[in-house]
Amino acid sequence: EQNFDLSKLFLNKEGKQAKGAEEAKVTIEYTNNPSWLMVKALPAISNPDEEDAISLMSAIYANTITNHVQKHLSLENLTQESIRLQNQVEKLKKLQNPDGSFSWWKGMKGSRYMTTSVAEMMVRLNAIAGVQKSTARMLTSAIDYLSWQTAQEVREMKKQEEKKQKVNPSEQALHYLYILSMDGRKMKQNLEADKAYLLEKMSKMTGDFSIYGKARAAVVLARNSQQNAAYREKAGEYLQSVNEYAVYREEMGRYYDTRKALYSWRNYKIPTQVSVIEAMQMLKPNDKQTIEELQRWLLMSKRTQVWDTPVNTVDAVYAFMKGNESNWNRKAENAVLKLDGKLLPMPQDSTTLGYVKTERPGKASKLSIDKKSDYTSWGAVYAEFKQPISEIGSMESGIKVRRVIVPAESESKGNAQVGEKVKVTLIITADRDYDFVQITDKRAACLEPVNQLSGYQWSIGCYVSPRDHATNFYFDRLSKGKHIVEMEYYVDRKGDYQSGTCTAECTYSPEFGGRTETYELKVNN
């Protein structure tokens, strides 16, 4: 039996009991079969609030995997999910441009990063659930676009070589080779030559790779070892080098505790972990213990229902589900769970699914688990309670946000009249160039946007999406320096109001971001 102290879940940043803790709700999640956590994570991304390329492709991935699991386990296949999937495919098609590239949001330029990410999800989905006819044409167009981009890169590399300069494939070229190795299609002769050129360069890059690059290169080289037997040996060397950097802690599992990487459009901790797992499954499939230790860290990085971004959730699902179909319906005797000494009842279907999720109102101080099986198990405890929004302070990490609200007809800031317009000005300062940045301005409840239509606004260079309680701004590129974003609102009722925060963050690398404090707005007749 193992005991866990839960008291720290109810403390504030000063180490004292947080306000609202007495009215908390405690959720306990536990499974003898971590593969089921992947299935449980899928609904959270299967019906997204946003209609950008990543959210839509993640949803297509989630709904297709759900259908695949239902068929595998002879469960009911829901018609509603199939209709939702068809709609999401149609919406994603509208974000693909004539050249095959994908735009992040409608109206934006096509992006190599975005196209690579969408195509990678497509080939991984095909690897788990079989070739998908609904996305096949989109994938072909995306690969054509990426092939053209890569051909340009190869041409430039050869020019540099003629000048006796050292050249290496870019990270995007590495992703391209991965997509081709997963897809398996035969390319035109000139594109096959580009591929062979890049593979040869990649096999000789030993000192120039990041941990992620080595793990991804190991997978690519192993998949291409039929055309060159030496590639498999080199793949093994890369994987061995990667494993020398691993850190192991019993609770956390096996992971890579390297210094924070230079900025990239997405956080690479989870992709690195997934690539190492993928390389291990290909090159050392019998080393089950190491693979399970790597998967344990992936589970520990899970945030309540899902990982921190849809694309990381998709990555994690792939790492657990690829080749693990036989484990989906593996049964094991349930563990005995006690909260503050009281036995927690188990739902009837928990034995079948190997998964338990239960809630209990109020604070809790101790969780006890008596495990009855030898399988890897995983659990989590979440505490939810409300705190005054005024206690949330500002913060910044690479991106700074300042917000100013100016009533058009009042003399003093912070006061407004019913029926007048106010202007909210956001001043965003970036310490470097950032990709795919989302700004969310949670406004006071008395404000209604003058322009309530979503769309790309060329004047400020971003996609604007007004919602019921907040306005979202999406920049596919936020350059270094200061940026001004302005929105006008009508004041529609009197009273004293408190806004929410305004946040700016890299959507797929959320450790880079900033947040403002809240503001008060007094509205007179």
Write out the residue ranges for each language-model feature.
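Extended, solvent-exposed functional surface patches
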Residues: 1-167, 173-184, 188-189, 264-265, ...
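Long, domain-scale non-catalytic interaction/scaffolding regions in large secretory-pathway
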Residues: 1-20, 160-166, 171-525
